[in-house]
């Protein structure tokens, strides 16, 4: 089913009201390349609406990637200006000194990532993973959580057959019956649960001090050269999340919002409402707070990096993770 731009424009009344009717005049078209993934979040409605392009005058190239590690590599090579990545690949990038900055928490992962075992595999607990084949995107938040889960159960990566796969590859391997378990997010998670059982979730580990999140990062060079774009972008991100917080009950199958999320993520529309509900989205005040961009996010990156180093996934730690996080753009957007 397709939906017209007027329907999405109606869904974005709250966003349009923030700015007025006309887009800013620009001398020449500027371009930004944005790397996104398949997480079900309100930003997909913004992407479909065209509001970012309209309000900034920039041409936005939306490029889909299979995992945060791929996004970080593309940013490192100069092919991407802004991208979505989980706290684990962001921590790895910061540890390597990549000149990027986390400026927005896309979501608190909460229960949106889960360890699922195939029915009939004999896996009833994390300890039962010993000797089994488990797929996960390496250096992702799911990988970080899986390694922590194994450690807590007295196992290591050597005790299981770990396969590094992107989400689409995991979906295909699960369909073929090639893997026994996976730690992954929707829409692959939704498909796996149809003939699998949830063994653990990200929320279980968050309650033990191993919280994970997805963030939006930009290269320091792009941020410095495009401050007005960054402020407008964050205003629109905040408006999209606020709209979901206020009207989320109406984001149902058949709504333009769900259609947009399904289109950009590749998820089935019927899976989108539950996919969105599995995450927690922060308001502007929470974003800028000391628990998040005001300090907590940097501490989370440090803790994640230390764990990654203990697992041999990074070789060095940054002396300070604060320079890789900023609340300044959120504060500017809130004015």
Pin down the residues of each PLM region:
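Short, hydrophobic alpha-helical packing/hinge segments within bilobed ligand-binding/sensory domains
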Residues: 70-72, 90, 170-173, 188-189, ...
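Sec/Tat signal peptide C-region and signal peptidase I cleavage site
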Residues: 21-27
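Bacterial N-terminal signal peptides
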Residues: 9-20
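Conserved C-terminal helix/tail region of periplasmic/extracytoplasmic solute-binding proteins
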Residues: 298-335
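Secondary-structure end/capping motifs
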Residues: 224-313
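Short, glycine-/small- and polar/acidic-enriched structural segments
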Residues: 28-156, 161-164, 180-186, 202, ...
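Periplasmic-binding protein-like
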Residues: 106-117, 198-222, 234, 321-328
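Bacterial N-terminal signal peptides that target proteins for export
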Residues: 1-11
């Amino acid at each position: 089913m397709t939906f017209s731009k007027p329907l999405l424009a109606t869904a974005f009344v709250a966003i349009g009201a923030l700015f007025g009717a006309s887009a800013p005049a620009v001398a020449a078209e500027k371009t930004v390349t944005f790397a996104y993934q398949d997480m079900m979040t309100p930003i997909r409605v913004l992407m479909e609406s065209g509001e970012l392009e309209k309000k900034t005058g920039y041409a936005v190239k939306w490029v889909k990637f299979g995992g945060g590690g791929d996004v970080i590599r593309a940013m490192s090579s100069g092919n991407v200006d802004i991208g979505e990545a989980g706290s684990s690949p962001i921590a790895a990038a910061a540890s390597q000194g990549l000149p990027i900055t986390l400026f927005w928490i896309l979501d608190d992962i909460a229960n949106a990532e889960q360890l699922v075992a195939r029915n009939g595999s004999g896996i009833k607990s994390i300890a039962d993973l010993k000797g089994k084949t488990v797929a996960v995107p390496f250096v992702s938040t799911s990988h970080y959580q899986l390694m922590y889960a194994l450690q807590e159960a007295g196992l290591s990566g050597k005790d299981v057959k770990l396969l590094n796969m992107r989400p689409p590859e995991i979906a295909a391997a699960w369909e073929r019956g090639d893997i026994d378990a996976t730690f992954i997010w929707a829409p692959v998670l939704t498909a796996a649960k149809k003939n699998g059982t949830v063994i653990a979730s990200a929320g279980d580990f968050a309650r033990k001090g191993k919280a994970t999140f997805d963030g939006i990062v930009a290269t320091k060079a792009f941020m410095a050269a495009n401050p007005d774009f960054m402020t407008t972008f964050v205003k629109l991100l905040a408006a999209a999340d606020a709209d979901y917080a206020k009207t989320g009950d109406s984001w149902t199958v058949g709504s333009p919002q769900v259609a947009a999320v399904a289109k950009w993520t590749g998820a089935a529309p019927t899976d989108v409402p539950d996919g969105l509900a599995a995450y927690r989205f922060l308001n502007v005040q929470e974003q800028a707070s000391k628990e998040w961009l005001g300090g907590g996010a940097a501490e989370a990156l440090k803790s994640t990096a230390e764990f990654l180093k203990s697992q041999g996934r990074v070789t060095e730690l940054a002396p300070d993770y604060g320079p890789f996080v900023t609340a300044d753009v959120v504060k500017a957007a809130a004015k």
